[in-house]
């Protein structure tokens, strides 16, 4: 793996994928931990080098899409701060750190414990897809059952996991792998195609909403 190439490419993500300031303000990012329970909880793991908890590209875009469709009913929670989105963790055996995996598991568990009536949707971008894969497949069945859909952008474990998340229903997972994005082929070589996923966030939002559409959603106390 060429960590220098990965560093240079991912360092450009903020410039390549700007998000409107108002959208960033809407996105929050720590609303499960700090806010009240909502009928829908969105848990997201950002790409390497992205700042904040949700990042500044696909995470806020999907969060805001859900909030616009389900006004007042969505809490958005990013994985962090133990998940640091550092570059070196991409080279670990599970393509992210044990601390990141455990933190994501804890957030899913917290959503179920704190807000037992909430429905969970989730997502990840780049290294964040590994965080989602490695955490969700380890969750107990009662927590997995609360996760209604997962969207993965530039899935770094796509080849290893055969386009799915192990021990989780394949039909609940939507993988976005752009033509030419070599991270989806089991490498960590990052090229321009890896930075095109903002264009998929509208479809990804609709995918998640499709699993929520027929649920009885009421405002939680």
From Swiss-Prot:
Disulfide bonds join 37-115, 63-76, 177-184. The lineage of its organism: Eukaryota, Fungi, Dikarya, Ascomycota, Pezizomycotina. One of its GO terms (biological process) is carbohydrate catabolic process. Gene3D superfamilies: alpha/beta hydrolase (3.40.50.1820). It is an enzyme of class 3 (hydrolase). The active site is at 126 (nucleophile), 181, 194 (proton donor/acceptor). It catalyses: cutin + H2O = cutin monomers. Residues 1-16 form the signal peptide. Keywords: Disulfide bond, Hydrolase, Secreted, Serine esterase, Signal. It is found in: Secreted. The keyword Lipid biosynthesis does not apply. Catalyzes the hydrolysis of complex carboxylic polyesters found in the cell wall of plants. Degrades cutin, a macromolecule that forms the structure of the plant cuticle. Its EC number is 3.1.1.74. The record marks 48, 127 as: Transition state stabilizer. Belongs to the cutinase family. InterPro entries: AB_hydrolase_fold (IPR029058), Cutinase/axe (IPR000675), CUTINASE_1 (IPR043580), CUTINASE_2 (IPR043579), Cutinase_monf (IPR011150). It comes from the Eukaryota. One of its GO terms (molecular function) is cutinase activity. SUPFAM superfamilies: alpha/beta-Hydrolases. One of its GO terms (cellular component) is extracellular region. This is Probable cutinase 2.
């Amino acid at each position: 793996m060429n960590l220098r190439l990965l560093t240079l490419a991912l360092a450009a993500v903020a410039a390549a994928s700007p998000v409107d300031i108002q959208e960033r303000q809407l996105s929050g990012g720590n609303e499960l931990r700090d806010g009240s329970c909502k009928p829908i909880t969105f848990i997201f793991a950002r790409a390497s080098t992205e700042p904040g908890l949700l990042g500044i590209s696909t995470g806020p875009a999907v969060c805001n899409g859900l909030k616009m469709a389900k006004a007042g009913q969505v809490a958005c929670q990013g994985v962090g701060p133990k998940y640091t989105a550092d570059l070196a963790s991409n080279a670990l055996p599970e393509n992210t750190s044990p601390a990141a995996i455990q933190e994501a598991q804890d957030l899913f568990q917290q959503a179920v414990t704190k807000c037992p009536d909430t429905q969970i949707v989730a997502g990840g971008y780049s290294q964040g897809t590994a965080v989602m894969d490695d955490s969700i497949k380890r969750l107990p069945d009662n927590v997995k059952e609360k996760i209604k859909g997962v969207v993965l952008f530039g899935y770094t474990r796509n080849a290893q996991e055969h386009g799915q998340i192990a021990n989780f229903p394949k039909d609940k997972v939507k993988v976005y792998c752009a033509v030419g994005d070599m991270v989806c082929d089991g490498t960590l070589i990052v090229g321009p195609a890896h930075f095109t996923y903002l264009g998929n966030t509208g479809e990804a939002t609709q995918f998640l909403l499709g699993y929520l559409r027929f649920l009885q959603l009421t405002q939680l106390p």
